[in-house]
């Protein structure tokens, strides 16, 4: 009761077409509700009248009132203000144009729904624009399920930093905290919100942005994602009609990103690649006039007659610094393992219906031998440098080459402690038989044929039986011994899997929290107890220290 008495309630009147903007600090949590019958929206999701809507710390957002309205806020944050400058009318116009395309597609007058790419510099509000457009589509009551494509690994819509994802939300997406801006994937506990179980497929880049070094890996990942979305549209007519929204990284604004050596004058190559892969028909540019002009002049854009639309950057978009981004990344990884955090008692105990945020997950920590968990890196190599090769020689390695990590090496080389690993499914056909093992099998086969030939020449049944048994025994023994040696060498030096597994859809994520060099074991944090679904993992550059 004492905690309830410290909760301060403040009423705020909003003019028609105005926004109430707020920025929560590390020690600020609020809950709000609308006291008027007229609708109030947060990222185009309508607030339920008189129901408390909790918002967790570090969140920066805004409420929009198309008509005059009154809201009530608990524990008014230090940074908040009301503004009549808003981009909601522009977003609504975009939505109406896309809704028309969906309806025409449903009637058979268009092949598919809108496919929209959203571009802009850092802190321009790309994810927020995408969230608004998705919520506007979901709020029509037409049963749309638009695809939300997350190509910004520094601001993942559903999972953790370093990941790319495809999700298909079917209900308006709430705004409660930094994690899961476009809905959370299914978990082992009951969902906290109606959009808590969003179907999500993920791929692992293992970095916060695409670069010229990982451009080839990026291209393959995007192609796999586009293929997965195409298969979904073939099976689900509604998904094809609903269309998709594609969030892009800020690095896409760099003209030379992904430019190849054989075509140094090419510009926006990764942008063009994504346009072709997902068959984009509309590009939305936020606030960047030069980018808008450059994209309009791209040969691919002109040949496909794409719509390139520029909208202003919202005045409520907050310029985030490195500390803000690091805070968001830590929160996102922690939420993946521990679930959504609980709100303080003075907010969760408010009288009135509200969305609960008190279902935490229970991650599982255990040890696993080095020999059982195969940790790989994509696009890296530990061979001798070019300077150590013979004069005139050069290294020719696949950009998708897999390299096995040796945990017994120096820490600055291994780089596994506190690293996030992506688990990938490995099938029997993904296994590569080492060269030595193949040679041993051939020797066994030849030996067996020779023995059979000698036995047939003898023509004696008793000797034939003895000879055959002896030959098989020797062959099997020799093969087993050689195979063991080959596997031992393979475990330490070669990667016994095809390169394709490095860019495959991932099954989940784990974190290596400790490395025991004496016992030769990892200590691993997994979101669920029990055995891992696979023992092959891909490492990247994403770190997270479990401070729980």
UniProtKB/Swiss-Prot annotation:
UniProt KW ATP-binding keyword: yes
Signal peptide range: none
Superkingdom, taxonomy of origin: Eukaryota
Annotated segments matching region Disordered: 437-500
Compositionally skewed regions (Acidic residues) per UniProt: 482-494
Residue ranges with Basic and acidic residues bias: 437-481
Binding annotation for ATP: 19, 60, 123-128
GO molecular function: ATP binding; ATP hydrolysis activity; polynucleotide 5'-hydroxyl-kinase activity
Keywords: ATP-binding, mRNA processing, Nucleotide-binding, Nucleus
InterPro entries listed in its UniProt record: AAA+_ATPase, Clp1, Clp1/Grc3, Clp1_C, Clp1_C_sf, Clp1_N, Clp1_N_sf, CLP1_P
Biological process according to GO: mRNA 3'-end processing; tRNA splicing, via endonucleolytic cleavage and ligation
Residue ranges the record marks as coiled coil: none
Record GO cellular component, one term: mRNA cleavage factor complex
Localization in the cell: Nucleus
Entry similarity comment: Belongs to the Clp1 family. Clp1 subfamily.
Function of the protein: Required for endonucleolytic cleavage during polyadenylation-dependent pre-mRNA 3'-end formation.
Subunit structure: Component of a pre-mRNA cleavage factor complex. Interacts directly with PCF11.
PANTHER family given in the database record: CLEAVAGE/POLYADENYLATION FACTOR IA SUBUNIT CLP1P, POLYRIBONUCLEOTIDE 5'-HYDROXYL-KINASE CLP1
Protein name: mRNA cleavage and polyadenylation factor CLP1
Organism: Cryptococcus neoformans var. neoformans serotype D (strain B-3501A) (Filobasidiella neoformans)
């Amino acid at each position: 009761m004492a905690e309830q008495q410290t909760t301060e309630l403040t009423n705020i009147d909003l003019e028609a077409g105005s926004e109430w903007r707020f920025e929560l600090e590390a020690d600020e949590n609020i809950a709000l509700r609308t006291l008027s019958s007229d609708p109030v929206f947060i990222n185009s999701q309508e607030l339920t009248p008189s129901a408390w809507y909790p918002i967790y710390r570090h969140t920066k957002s805004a409420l929009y009132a198309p008509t005059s309205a009154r809201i009530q806020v608990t524990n008014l944050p230090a940074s908040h203000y009301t503004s009549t400058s808003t981009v909601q009318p522009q977003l609504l116009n975009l939505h109406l144009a896309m809704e028309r395309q969906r309806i025409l597609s449903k009637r058979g007058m268009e092949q598919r729904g809108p496919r929209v790419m959203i571009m802009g510099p850092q802190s321009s509000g790309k994810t927020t624009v995408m969230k608004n457009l998705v919520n506007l589509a979901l709020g029509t009551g037409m049963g749309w399920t638009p695809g939300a494509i997350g190509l910004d690994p520094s601001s993942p819509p559903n999972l953790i930093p370093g990941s790319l994802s495809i999700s298909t939300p079917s209900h308006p997406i709430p705004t409660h905290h930094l994690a899961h801006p476009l809905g959370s994937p299914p978990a082992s506990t009951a969902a906290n919100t109606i959009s808590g179980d969003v179907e999500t497929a993920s791929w692992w880049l293992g970095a916060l942005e695409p670069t010229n070094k990982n451009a080839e890996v990026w291209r393959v990942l995007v192609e796999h994602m586009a293929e997965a979305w195409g298969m979904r549209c073939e099976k689900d007519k509604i998904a094809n009609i609903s269309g998709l929204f594609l969030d892009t990284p800020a690095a896409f604004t760099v003209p030379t990103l992904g430019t190849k050596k054989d075509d140094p004058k090419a510009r926006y190559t990764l942008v063009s690649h994504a346009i072709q892969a997902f068959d984009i028909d509309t590009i939305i540019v936020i606030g960047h006039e030069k980018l808008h002009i450059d994209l309009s002049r791209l040969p691919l854009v002109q040949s496909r007659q794409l719509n390139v639309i520029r909208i202003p950057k919202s005045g409520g978009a907050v310029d985030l610094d490195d500390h803000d981004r690091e805070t968001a990344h830590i929160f996102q990884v922690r939420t993946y393992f521990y679930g959504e955090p609980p709100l303080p008692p003075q907010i969760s105990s408010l009288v009135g219906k509200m969305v609960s945020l008190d279902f935490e997950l229970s991650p599982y920590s255990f040890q696993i031998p080095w020999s059982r968990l195969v940790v790989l890196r994509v696009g890296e190599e530990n061979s001798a440098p070019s300077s150590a090769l013979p004069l005139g020689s050069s290294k020719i390695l696949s950009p998708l080459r897999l390299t096995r990590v040796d945990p017994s090496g120096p820490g600055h080389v291994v780089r596994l402690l506190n690293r996030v690993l992506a688990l990938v499914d490995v099938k029997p056909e993904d296994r590569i038989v080492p060269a030595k093992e193949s040679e041993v099998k051939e020797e066994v086969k030849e030996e067996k044929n020779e023995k059979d030939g000698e036995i047939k020449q003898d023509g004696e049944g008793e000797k034939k039986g003895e000879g055959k048994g002896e030959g098989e025994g020797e062959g099997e023994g020799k093969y087993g011994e050689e195979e063991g040696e080959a596997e031992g060498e393979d475990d330490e030096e070669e990667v016994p899997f095809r390169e394709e597994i490095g860019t495959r859809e991932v099954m989940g994520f784990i974190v290596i929290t400790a490395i025991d060099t004496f016992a030769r074991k990892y200590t691993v944090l997994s979101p669920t107890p029990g055995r891992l679904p696979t023992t092959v993992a891909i490492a990247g550059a994403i770190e997270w220290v479990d401070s729980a």
